[in-house]
UniProtKB/Swiss-Prot annotation:
Catalyzes the conversion of 3-deoxy-D-arabino-heptulosonate 7-phosphate (DAHP) to dehydroquinate (DHQ). It comes from Bacillus cereus (strain ATCC 10987 / NRS 248). Zn(2+) binds at E184, H247, H264. Keywords: Amino-acid biosynthesis, Aromatic amino acid biosynthesis, Cobalt, Cytoplasm, Lyase, Metal-binding, NAD, Nucleotide-binding, Zinc. Gene3D superfamilies: 3.40.50.1970, Dehydroquinate synthase-like - alpha domain. It is found in: Cytoplasm. It catalyses: 7-phospho-2-dehydro-3-deoxy-D-arabino-heptonate = 3-dehydroquinate + phosphate. Its cofactor is Co(2+); Zn(2+); NAD(+). Belongs to the sugar phosphate cyclases superfamily. Dehydroquinate synthase family. Pfam families: DHQ_synthase, DHQS_C. This is 3-dehydroquinate synthase.
């Protein structure tokens, strides 16, 4: 098992990664000061049916524990569920000394974290991620819900008390969720750990390799990339935006295709390829785009859909949180491990997207 220490300006906490990580949950709760009054577990239907009782059993404490369960899927990260969670919290008499446990993937972590950030102006919460994708979202304190006009547009920065990454929970994931989460692993390697990138190319030939000791190795290498960036820039005023590599187009694809019709990781994978494609043009460098494209396709990542309207995508990219004064800002790569946020004219993005779309046919 590997423990990773996270340090930000507002809080320090640990990420527990391994096959026995759930055993730490009781101690984490018992050591909180002031003592926890009661506990609300927020989860989704798919995860709750598999893991909720195990988490309740792991909480060997004499506190009231209750659950709030929403349907599964990114579209459930909504204001309606956010409001309903607050209603449940009030009905079950949560107070300022209560604790929320986010049990699930990134959607649940974002929803539960935002409930914790806003209930009585902020109470404590613990992340218990159940997906590979959540190795990214569970760390760093960004919590949010979606708006019909954009993803993660309503939210806050609210750090957890701890992250408990019990890797056996991941074994129930379907292949598409392994692939989705692996895209964020690749992202962390490309922007902040070139040694990990080369290790992935050698050691992860198929998604089935993302198991056991290799999985723990990946998590204990990828999470510190994010931790180091968050330590420098907790509230995304500068370098934290580098973590959005691939996300400008990725989020646009999610919005255009409809949440649930493309996974977050698949969208980010296409977005990273486009960012590399455009970076070669902007920086006049060779980033081995063709080789990277074949590597991504080997894992089953999708191609850029040929029937999407490029002009609409450009419009959606201008709604990205990095956009400034109506201009598209993208994270581009100078070389592996070195990225920058760059303002790109609409016409340049449009021309590049059309060329990228044709190349991916």
């Amino acid at each position: 098992m590997g423990n990773i220490h996270i340090q930000t300006k507002s809080k320090e906490y640990d990420v527990y990664v391994g096959k026995e990580s759930l055993s730490h949950l009781t101690t984490i709760v018992q050591n909180m000061k002031p003592s926890v009054s009661n506990i609300m577990i927020i989860s989704d239907e798919a995860v709750a049916s598999l893991h909720l009782q195990m988490v309740v059993d792991a909480l060997q404490i004499e506190k009231k524990v209750f659950s709030f369960v929403v349907p599964s899927g990114e579209k459930e990260k909504s204001f309606e569920n956010f409001y309903a969670a607050h209603t449940s919290a009030l009905e079950n008499k949560l107070d300022r000394n209560s604790l929320i446990i986010a049990l699930g993937g990134g959607m649940i972590g974002d929803l539960a974290g935002f409930v914790a950030a806003s209930f009585m102006r902020g109470i404590r919460f613990v992340q218990v991620p159940t997906t590979l994708l959540a190795h990214d979202s569970a760390v760093g304190g960004k919590v949010a819900i979606n708006h019909p006009l954009g993803k993660n547009m309503i939210g806050a920065f609210h750090q957890p008390e701890a992250v408990v990454y019990h890797t056996p929970f991941l074994q129930s994931l379907p292949e598409k969720e392994w692939r989705s989460g692996y895209a964020e692993v690749i992202k962390h390697a490309l922007i902040g750990d070139v040694k990990l990138y080369h290790w992935l190319k050698e050691e992860v030939q198929t998604l089935a390799d993302l198991r056991d000791e290799k999985l723990i190795h990946i998590l204990t290498k990828a999470i510190p990339v994010k931790a180091n960036i968050v330590a420098q820039d907790e509230t995304e005023k500068g370098v934290r935006a580098h973590l959005n590599f691939g996300h400008t187009l990725g989020h646009a694809l999610e919005k255009e295709l409809g949440y649930g019709n493309i996974t977050h990781g698949d969208g980010v994978a296409v977005g990273m390829l486009f960012a590399i494609f455009l970076s070669e043009q902007v920086y006049k460098v060779n980033l081995a785009y063709e080789e990277m494209k074949q590597w991504f396709l080997k894992y089953g990542y999708p191609k850029m859909p040929s029937d999407l309207n490029v002009e609409r995508l450009v419009g959606l990219m201008k709604q990205d949180k990095k956009a400034n004064a109506g201009a598209i800002h993208m994270v581009l790569m100078q070389e592996y491990g070195v990225v920058n946020v760059v303002s790109i004219p609409d016409e340049t993005v449009h021309i590049a997207l059309e060329a990228f779309q044709k190349d991916m046919v």
